[in-house]
Swiss-Prot record:
Keywords: ATP-binding, Cell membrane, Membrane, Nucleotide-binding, Peptide transport, Protein transport, Translocase, Transport. The gene is dppF. This is Dipeptide transport ATP-binding protein DppF. It is a peripheral membrane protein. Disruption phenotype: Inactivation of the gene impairs growth on low concentrations of di-valine. ATP binds at residues 45-52. CDD domains: ABC_NikE_OppD_transporters (cd03257). One of its GO terms (biological process) is transmembrane transport. The lineage of its organism: Bacteria, Bacillati, Bacillota, Bacilli, Lactobacillales.
Length: 312
């Protein structure tokens, strides 16, 4: 069986804000991560865990803060890209932002917002070609001709996010960082946007890094999931492994915090409390494979216990 192609490969990444200053903050601490072609890799964790920082680092937005490690895109270190290679990478890797209102220019019409990438990269030669491509993109995300000349404030939150998705797809990317793309949306339309992203992924063979707080939605859309806390990835596995067979205490704590819609079971639910200081014991920890494809940040002794429990 052919091994799947790695689109993104992060090796021992360290990233520090305000390095050398009193308020230095090590946002990413020795993180390694692979994202394969055509998959959706979900990244979950509490606010401040470093999820968005990883996504922005992949897109070269935080190059000045990286203090160690590598970020490879199709085998090339993105920090070394220059000239035509950098221009090509800007097209191949795109981002869908968390707040559809703030990420769209309120003074621009939809057709010009979506066409920004086309214009900047010289992907269309005539106005007719430009208009046809913009209309194709709007239809792809469930909008129509009537929306071309409207402004962002004339749309609902879900429609604005669809415009943001169309803009990201305009340059035909291979990889998309979706930074909490549904958290600012009404619950009633979150599933619509996620289903739209899945449909587009199948049509365009896209690879997603899906960053979110909503654990149930991450489970629904993701092939594999990584759990982050304090700048480290603590557990990586398939959606089924992480949700149905969590191993790391923090993952168990995170999942136990999900409220139940049943009021009786909700009253009986006992959340698991995670003590992060338990890992500040000076012992060396690294990502270790517990079951095939299921990795946990642990010491060698902890890994042996996890493996034994996994076979019970």
């Amino acid at each position: 069986m052919t091994e799947p192609k790695k689109v993104v490969e992060i090796k021992n990444l360290d990233l520090t804000f305000n390095k050398g200053k009193k308020g230095a903050n090590k946002a990413i601490n020795n993180v390694s991560l692979d994202i394969y072609e055509g998959e959706t890799f979900g990244l979950v964790g509490e606010s401040g865990s470093g999820k968005t920082t990883i996504g922005r680092a992949i897109l070269k937005l935080y190059d000045n803060f990286i203090t160690g490690g590598e970020i490879l895109f199709e085998g090339k270190d993105v920090r070394n890209l220059k000239g035509s290679e950098l221009r090509e990478y800007r097209s191949e890797a795109q981002m869908i932002f968390q707040d559809p209102q703030a990420s769209l220019n309120g003074r621009m019409r939809v057709k010009d917002i979506v066409a920004e990438g086309l214009d900047a990269n010289g992907l269309v030669k005539t106005k007719a070609e430009r208009d046809a491509r913009v209309l194709e993109l709007l239809r792809l995300v469930g909008l129509n001709d009537d929306h071309l000349t409207r402004y962002p404030h004339e749309f609902s939150g879900g429609q604005r996010q669809r415009i943001g998705i169309a803009r990201a797809l305009a340059v035909k990317p291979k990889f998309v960082v979706a930074d909490e793309p549904i958290s600012a949306l009404d619950v009633s339309i979150q599933a619509q946007v996620v289903n739209l992203m899945r449909d587009i992924q199948a049509k365009e063979n896209l690879t997603y890094l899906f960053i979110a707080h909503d654990l149930s939605m991450v489970k629904y859309i993701s092939d594999r999931i990584g759990v982050m806390h304090w700048g480290k990835i603590l557990e990586v596995g398939t959606s089924e492994q992480v949700y149905n067979h969590p191993i790391h205490p923090y993952t168990k704590s995170l999942l136990s915090s999900i409220p139940s819609p049943d009021p009786i079971s909700e009253r009986q639910r006992t959340p698991i409390v995670y003590d992060p200081t338990a890992e500040l014991d000076g012992q060396e920890r690294e990502m270790r494979e517990i079951t095939p494809g299921h990795f946990v940040f642990s010491t060698e002794a902890e890994a042996e216990v996890y493996k034994k429990n996994a076979t019970l």
